């Protein structure tokens, strides 16, 4: 039996934990995100705080240790839509339903914001694609 997972919304005070997980995700999965380790690692503390202040970012924790992140933002391309970005779970904690739980929680956030759609981007070769498909997302080719 696995330890229970707790999801909570990150605050700007969580920037160090968020930064560590975000940089690790960019290091271990450089093709999975719309940014790079080189672009984000030199950013100042205030930049990281600002990201958390202007988004709905979740921290997934097991025994008080952050093991995953997922962010909901206003869709940059479509008014009234929300977008899931930067979803990532530490490799040793995958397969426990953490990503699915974050997706479901972010979907509730989007519905509460009266979003008419939830979008995300994932490459064809990304193993996370299966998680999104099981959560009901469909490829649009965009």
Can you describe what each PLM-predicted range is?
Residues 96:
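Flexible nucleotide-binding loop
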Residues 4-7:
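Extreme N-terminal starter segment of soluble prokaryotic enzymes
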